Amino acid sequence: MWTYVLFNIKSNLKRKENLILVVLFIICEIALLFILNTKSFTESPYQTSLGISIASVSQKNDPKLYQEFMDEVNLIRQTIDKGEQDGKEKNWKSYCEYKVKVSVLEAQWYMVTSNMPNDSYFEHADVLEQLRKEYGLPDLSQYEKLIVQKSNDINLYFCSMQQARYFDYLLKHDLTPITYSYVDASSVSLQIARYILPVVLPLLVGLLLFQQRERRAKTEKTILTISGVKKKYVRWNLISDVLFVLLVVFMPILVYMIVLVPFKGVSNLIYPVLYYKPGFTGFHYWDTQGLDHIELVASGLTNMSVNQFTTPGMELMPLWQCTLFVAFGIVMSTTFYVLLITVLSKLMKNKYLSLLVFLVVLGLCSFASPLGNMQKINTFNPMSYRDFGMNLLGTSYFGYF
């Protein structure tokens, strides 16, 4: 039967209308890569630091300790000034070291000034303490008695904590910071997966396969008369259709990767990306405030939320592993789309009607589940998981699996 699958794939590739669709798909991908590559030159990994806020401290409790604290704050400000200059001059190693130091101190200060219980909110506090000792940084908790009023706002802790871990990873793996739109052999598959495939993949499946019902109708009538063959025929047709679409999706990506290797290499395969860990444990719904209220900070190939309470759930993952998970998502989504168009083509005798219903169903499901949608019912909406990159990397409301 694998011979039949191969025959089906070859016959699909030879069809003129399919070739036109594949060419248009490749043109869209190449155009996207050129746009992203151009955009990456205007972006910069450089980020400013907030520093240590002194609004909540007072010298009344201990003037001498207050003076020591202000001396530390001035040293931190000098570190920020030098680090920001390193960033502007693209001295990335010194810049990363500065970001680790300042982010660790910021995160520790947010812990000190917050009245939230440490065990409930301050994840990775042990990692931050380890980094503080490793980089020879002062312990800001000794200045806790200077605080007049503690705060309930812990969102900035999350951001600083992740920044510290992110830039420490870059330093220890001798990696240069890259931007959100960066394109090389390591990142090309992720960029295509999050910019093109969420919209184009269902269209590609529908347009490539909607004529299959008509072409196979006569064969199916003959197969019906042969006992035990019909199920195998349907099964192998499904397999060939899925493999055909996956071939159309993955072959160009593989070619792009091979072409880009001589220009930028593959060193970024170990580049860290942030992913949403709770999304790997099951259907997970983010109990957050809505995307309209979220400030996103770019951390390499991922965006990180400043004011989302779910940010502590973010962990670091090497890019090669992220790429494998995204590829798995593409396979699963393709299988779902092929099954749906196959069922509709069986139920409806008119190929145009089945295509229309296919697109309308997916369109309505997508409309019902935008990224800012807060209804838990959409946990079971398949189109909530249409953006493989965003589901995995934590800027969608729904976990990856």
Show which residues each predicted segment covers.
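Helix-loop-helix units of permease transmembrane domains in multi-pass membrane transporters
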Residues: 4-8, 13, 210-244
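Short, membrane-interfacial amphipathic segments enriched in basic
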Residues: 1-5, 317
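Secretory targeting signals
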Residues: 28-40, 46-56, 162, 166-214, ...
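Transmembrane helix segments
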Residues: 323, 351-378
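Membrane-interface helix starts
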Residues: 9-27, 351-355
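Membrane-embedded or membrane-proximal helical elements that form or frame transporter/channel pores
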Residues: 33, 37-206, 388-400
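Residue-level recognition of pore/gate-forming positions within transmembrane alpha-helices
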Residues: 25-29, 241, 359-363
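Helix-loop interface residues and adjacent transmembrane-helix termini in multi-pass membrane transporters
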Residues: 227, 347-348
